[in-house]
Amino acid sequence: MEVHELFRYFRMPELIDIRQYVRTLPTNTLMGFGAFAALTTFWYATRPKALKPPCDLSMQSVEIAGTTDGIRRSAVLEDDKLLVYYYDDVRTMYDGFQRGIQVSNNGPCLGSRKPNQPYEWISYKEVAELAECIGSGLIQKGFKPCSEQFIGLFSQNRPEWVIVEQGCFSYSMVVVPLYDTLGADAITYIVNKAELSVIFADKPEKAKLLLEGVENKLTPCLKIIVIMDSYGSDLVERGKKCGVEIISLKALEDLGRVNRVKPKPPEPEDLAIICFTSGTTGNPKGAMITHQNIINDCSGFIKATESAFIASTDDVLISFLPLAHMFETVVECVMLCHGAKIGFFQGDIRLLMDDLKVLQPTIFPVVPRLLNRMFDRIFGQANTSLKRWLLDFASKRKEAELRSGIVRNNSLWDKLIFHKIQSSLGGKVRLMITGAAPVSATVLTFLRTALGCQFYEGYGQTECTAGCCLSLPGDWTAGHVGAPMPCNYVKLVDVEEMNYLASKGEGEVCVKGANVFKGYLKDPARTAEALDKDGWLHTGDIGKWLPNGTLKIIDRKKHIFKLAQGEYIAPEKIENIYLRSEAVAQVFVHGESLQAFLIAVVVPDVESLPSWAQKRGLQGSFEELCRNKDINKAILDDLLKLGKEAGLKPFEQVKGIAVHPELFSIDNGLLTPTLKAKRPELRNYFRSQIDELYATIKI
């Protein structure tokens, strides 16, 4: 065959040939082709698309050039220069709110509700008006519009908190939050340390608590209490007797309204908040947080997530995490500078699910304890093996999409399995963020699949204004806390006594950036412990760099102790492993320098224990099971199994446990207000059980 004949043999058909061929096809065949083409086009147009990651997710942080101590920065940044501000016109909390007024076009700002009622909203300009009235009222009462003027704020989350806070910021005053879970002694300490002469309280009961301090001559500096709710004349008289003026928030507003003072906004370097952190030992420490600290941390979040999320006036935040902590403060700052709405819960955590259904938030910040409850409740309702299998199967299918970067809530599995879960949160959540404590990878991964929204995990502490690391859009894997935020550097330093070496990519997490605090109020000794001479914040957490440039928190430097044979023990690491047991709600691992082994006090999970025990042929009430020696042995065996799977060394495993039926709590003095274990108090509380275990266990 000639070459030209070969070409002619393989030539593409002419268009006229195709037309003639199509004309010969039956109508049904043509309709089938058309339907197939339409379906293909529809699939292509509506197929789930992966979120665009802001950088190469296989290398989310990079080492700073020319350094020898392993300093790393976010790969989101174009160079080694850290982000300071995201918006040029937002450099203080005051600026952020003013931007919110503009971009919202004076839209709704703060919302609250009464029982069984819808949310009622006040606009951005109404908030600004009330804030200026309150600030002017304070000035009329003799308070100075400067960053040396501290104003106490003792309240649950509610619109008045933001209004009072903005009133302070409008005149460069500094907010000092108080919260009742601190306890009376700690509140007295803070009032004196910050020399608070005026405190805003939401309820008369809190005003009475404050008055007790003055009456007992413990807080002589306190002169004015402003109360948000209504109160009786007896409280006014009681205040007069000890030299404290009791005034309503409305009266202070009215005073400022007729004595208006032009705002005196703060500078970025001015103090904004003195956030007292509850330590596990000693008095609270007052972290001095500037406007720049807060705006810088907000800017870091916005920059890290901008490829997939930018808050807008359509967004609604549910405010229930304490505003006395920096996590919620930073989240609300991000919302306000974008003109979004903030709806407050009714003040009762038991009504939160009802508030969520009514408010239908799009932004939902959470803490691990709430996530664990959600996870347990979901699987608790899946009371048959078939239901559990379906949940697990659907979750695995959506987890495969997550690994491809796809986040959605409209898949077949969402419609069949997860719709009710999503509806329980209002049905419109598009972003969740968790922080403040470690969260189980199992829990986080499942809820990411079930809730079908962008779900970020952050890491930080009060001293770096809430966050210093954050997971990035597109990386929905669990088991790490993300990469350094674009506003700060992170490095690891050696902790030789625990065998963590920076050269091996492990060590104490240290942070440096414009989000790092200025020190502790009137406490140079503890400031020097936290901040070194080069401005690095030493967190006390042990981290490990993963191959993709993310950070994994693996241990805690504090609370380490030696056993008799000289081995170092980090009890919190062991506790976090043991908490993976289905039967366990809380665990306290204890060791002593004169003893060669560890023991633990375990509080079983009141909801999970009965079914867990039944699978092992054991029955009884919760209290009976807690006293059952067979349950004790079964729980111990489960803990040891988990420890072995997690790679604990033999000396890191407990040799015996005491089962205790009552949860460690703030009320019984065994947890701090931020739900961290008070180890000295736990040691004293369980001294008899500890002594008995050491006396009876022979190794």
Swiss-Prot record:
The modification Phosphoserine is found at residue 621. The lineage of its organism: Eukaryota, Metazoa, Chordata, Craniata, Vertebrata. It catalyses: a long-chain fatty acid + ATP + CoA = a long-chain fatty acyl-CoA + AMP + diphosphate; (5Z,8Z,11Z,14Z)-eicosatetraenoate + ATP + CoA = (5Z,8Z,11Z,14Z)-eicosatetraenoyl-CoA + AMP + diphosphate; 3,7,11,15-tetramethylhexadecanoate + ATP + CoA = phytanoyl-CoA + AMP + diphosphate; hexadecanoate + ATP + CoA = hexadecanoyl-CoA + AMP + diphosphate. This is Long-chain-fatty-acid--CoA ligase 1. It is found in: Mitochondrion outer membrane; Peroxisome membrane; Microsome membrane; Endoplasmic reticulum membrane. It comes from the Eukaryota. Pfam families: AMP-binding. It comes from Mus musculus (Mouse). The modification N6-acetyllysine is found at residues 208, 357, 387, 633. GO terms for biological process: adiponectin-activated signaling pathway; fatty acid biosynthetic process; linoleic acid metabolic process; long-chain fatty acid import into cell; long-chain fatty acid metabolic process; long-chain fatty-acyl-CoA biosynthetic process; positive regulation of cold-induced thermogenesis; positive regulation of long-chain fatty acid import across plasma membrane. Keywords: Acetylation, ATP-binding, Endoplasmic reticulum, Fatty acid metabolism, Glycoprotein, Ligase, Lipid metabolism, Magnesium, Membrane, Microsome, Mitochondrion, Mitochondrion outer membrane, Nitration, Nucleotide-binding, Peroxisome, Phosphoprotein, Signal-anchor, Transmembrane, Transmembrane helix. Residues 46-699 are cytoplasmic. Inhibited at high temperature and by arachidonate. Glycans are attached at residue 136. Its cofactor is Mg(2+). InterPro entries: AMP-binding_CS, AMP-dep_synth/lig_dom, ANL_N_sf, LC-FACS_euk. Belongs to the ATP-dependent AMP-binding enzyme family. Its EC number is 6.2.1.3, 6.2.1.15, 6.2.1.24. GO terms for molecular function: arachidonate-CoA ligase activity; ATP binding; long-chain fatty acid-CoA ligase activity; oleoyl-CoA ligase activity; palmitoyl-CoA ligase activity; phytanate-CoA ligase activity; pristanate-CoA ligase activity; protein serine/threonine kinase activator activity. The modification N-acetylmethionine is found at residue 1. The modification Phosphotyrosine is found at residue 85.
